[in-house]
C-alpha cells in the first residue's frame, strides 16, 4: 500500500481555481482534466515495459512500450470527469463503469450499474473518483473490480482529487493492497460527510447541475 499526496505548484494552482465558488462548470471540468493528466506522471510509475523494434527515418532501433492493458473505472457520475485526463496519457485504456447510490436506511453504497471490458483480468486498473469522503463508495467499487472476474487484475490503483483523512484511513484498511493517489488531503469531513473545506459537489460542478 502506498498513499501519495501531491505537492506540486501546477496542481496546487489549478486546484485553488477549482475550489473557487465562482468557477463555472466548463472551466471546472477543464481544470479537473488537466490535474488528472499531471497526476498520471506519478500514477504511471512502476508499470512494466516491453522491448520493441521501431523504424525511424534514419534507422531501426530498440524502443519500449507499456506491456499490459489498462482499464480505467470511473465511479458514476463524477468519476467521468477524470477519464479524458487519463486518456491524454494512455489513449488505449479501455473504460469500465460503476454506478452506486446510497441506501437511505443503511447509508451504505448500493450498486445499480456496472460494466467492464473483458481485458480486466489481464491488465492494470485505475479507479477514478474526484472525492474520497467517507471512502464507502470507493471501497465498494474496488471490491466490485476485484470480484467481477475469476482472475484478478494485475494491479488496482485509486486516483482522486480531494480526500478526507477519515476516508483515506477507511480505504487503506479495507484494501491495503491498493495504492492511493490524491491531489490534496483536506482537513476533515463536516457533519454532513462533505470534505471540508473541499470544493462542493464535484458531480454538480462538472456537469453544471444542482
UniProtKB/Swiss-Prot annotation:
Binds 1 Mg(2+) ion per subunit. The magnesium is bound as Mg-PRPP. Keywords: Allosteric enzyme, Glycosyltransferase, GTP-binding, Magnesium, Nucleotide-binding, Transferase. Pathway: Pyrimidine metabolism; UMP biosynthesis via salvage pathway; UMP from uracil: step 1/1. GO terms for molecular function: GTP binding; magnesium ion binding; uracil phosphoribosyltransferase activity. Its cofactor is Mg(2+). The keyword Membrane does not apply. One of its GO terms (biological process) is UMP salvage. It is an enzyme of class 2 (transferase). InterPro entries: PRibTrfase_dom, PRTase-like, Upp_B, UPRTase/APRTase, Ura_phspho_trans. It catalyses: UMP + diphosphate = 5-phospho-alpha-D-ribose 1-diphosphate + uracil. Allosterically activated by GTP. Belongs to the UPRTase family. Catalyzes the conversion of uracil and 5-phospho-alpha-D-ribose 1-diphosphate (PRPP) to UMP and diphosphate. This is Uracil phosphoribosyltransferase. It comes from Mycoplasmoides gallisepticum (strain R(low / passage 15 / clone 2)). The gene is upp.
Amino acid at each position: 500500500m502506498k498513499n501519495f499526496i501531491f505537492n506540486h505548484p501546477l496542481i496546487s494552482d489549478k486546484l485553488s481555481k477549482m475550489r473557487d465558488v465562482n468557477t463555472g462548470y466548463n472551466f471546472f471540468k477543464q481544470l479537473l482534466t488537466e490535474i488528472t493528466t499531471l497526476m498520471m506522471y506519478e500514477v504511471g510509475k512502476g508499470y512494466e515495459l516491453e522491448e520493441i523494434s521501431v523504424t525511424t527515418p534514419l534507422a531501426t532501433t530498440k524502443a519500449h512500450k507499456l506491456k499490459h492493458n489498462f482499464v480505467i473505472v470511473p465511479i458514476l457520475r463524477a468519476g467521468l470527469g477524470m477519464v479524458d485526463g487519463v486518456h491524454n496519457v494512455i489513449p488505449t485504456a479501455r473504460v469500465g463503469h460503476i454506478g452506486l447510490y446510497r441506501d437511505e436506511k443503511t447509508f451504505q453504497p448500493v450498486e445499480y450499474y456496472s460494466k467492464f471490458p473483458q481485458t480486466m483480468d489481464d491488465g492494470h486498473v485505475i479507479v477514478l473518483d474526484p472525492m474520497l469522503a467517507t471512502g464507502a463508495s470507493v471501497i465498494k467499487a474496488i471490491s466490485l473490480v476485484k470480484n467481477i472476474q475469476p482472475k484478478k487484475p494485475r494491479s488496482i490503483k485509486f486516483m482522486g482529487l480531494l480526500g478526507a483523512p477519515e476516508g483515506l484511513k477507511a480505504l487503506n484498511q479495507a484494501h491495503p493492497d491498493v495504492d492511493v493517489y490524491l491531489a490534496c488531503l483536506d482537513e476533515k469531513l463536516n457533519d454532513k460527510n462533505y470534505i471540508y473545506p473541499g470544493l462542493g459537489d464535484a458531480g454538480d460542478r462538472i456537469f453544471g447541475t444542482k
